[in-house]
Regions:
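Flexible, glycine/charged-enriched surface loops at secondary-structure junctions
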Residues: 46-53, 95-103
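Short helix-loop-beta junction
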Residues: 83-96
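Charged, often glycine-rich, active-site loop that binds/positions anionic groups
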Residues: 110-123
């Protein structure tokens, strides 16, 4: 379960994209997820974005989920197994499921990748081998220490994201790329608000395939980066989401308990 942004303190974690990342819970069943989430939720004086338990309880949405939207634009490239998982989940939940179109929600990935890379670029700047992070053994000066330490410690995917983030924040790209991504985020949030005016939750795939083999990952090392197409909507909006039975449920803010109740039935 990925809780609503602000439910759990991020203090003590390695920051990547501070405006959207959350501390989530992975467990074998919904009951355990709920128990752990109850234990870790609440305000932390060292994290200004974390909310007090009283405020979380006050904002909690406990409305029963009876009507779910399935977004067609998020189903286009998924395998037959994933489509079968969606159908199976709907049948088990016994809710009304309606297929809708929303190219806005499908635009979450490019917008989130821009924002995430830009924030990541700033957040990892501290890992220079002096005070934080890996320290290279061989260097002839401070500049070479920075270069060697980061070259040795960072993987290819991280380096790619840093370069992309740096370009995104450059003077020539800031307004036409980064600022546009911020405005796109606002539009996506508004789109979810419109959907939730008619539906109680959104159901989309968690991945394009039901499972991946080691060979799949070796053949395409960027596969996990591509799969965030399905998790980006919840990340960029800060909405809660639950993955169970190969499907993903996204709910209204602070509706984690209701989502977990559904997850226990899938």
């Amino acid at each position: 379960v990925k809780p609503t942004y602000g439910t759990v303190s991020r203090y003590g974690t390695v920051p990547v994209a501070c405006s959207g990342e959350t501390v989530s819970v992975m467990a074998k069943d919904a009951k355990t997820c709920r128990k752990v989430l109850d234990d870790i939720a609440g305000h932390d004086d060292k994290d200004g974005t974390s909310l007090p338990e009283s405020e979380i309880a006050k904002k909690a949405d406990a409305k029963e989920i009876k009507r779910i939207a399935i977004i067609n634009d998020m189903m286009a490239d998924v395998s037959d197994d994933v489509k079968a998982n969606i159908d199976s989940a709907v049948a088990k939940l016994g809710v009304e499921a309606v297929n809708i179109d929303s190219s806005v929600i499908a635009a979450s990935r490019p917008a989130w990748n821009i924002l995430m890379s830009a924030e990541l670029c700033n957040n990892v700047s501290r890992y220079d081998g002096v005070k934080y992070g890996h320290r290279a053994e061989k260097f002839s000066g401070i500049d070479e220490l920075y270069t060697n330490s980061r070259t040795e410690a960072f993987g290819e995917l991280l380096k790619t994201a840093i370069i992309f983030g740096s370009e995104t924040l450059s003077t020539e790209n800031y307004m036409k790329v980064y600022d546009k991504a911020l405005r796109t985020r606002r539009v996506i949030v508004e789109e979810f608000a419109k959907i939730f005016a008619e539906f109680d939750a959104v159901m989309i795939p968690a991945c394009s395939k039901a499972f991946y083999t080691e060979e799949n990952v070796k053949a395409d090392k960027y596969i996990s980066y591509k799969e965030n197409f399905y998790t980006a909507p919840a990340s960029i909006t800060g909405l809660p989401a639950v993955v169970a039975g190969g499907v993903q449920l996204i709910g209204k803010a602070f509706s984690e308990n209701v989502l977990l109740e559904l997850a226990s039935k899938i």
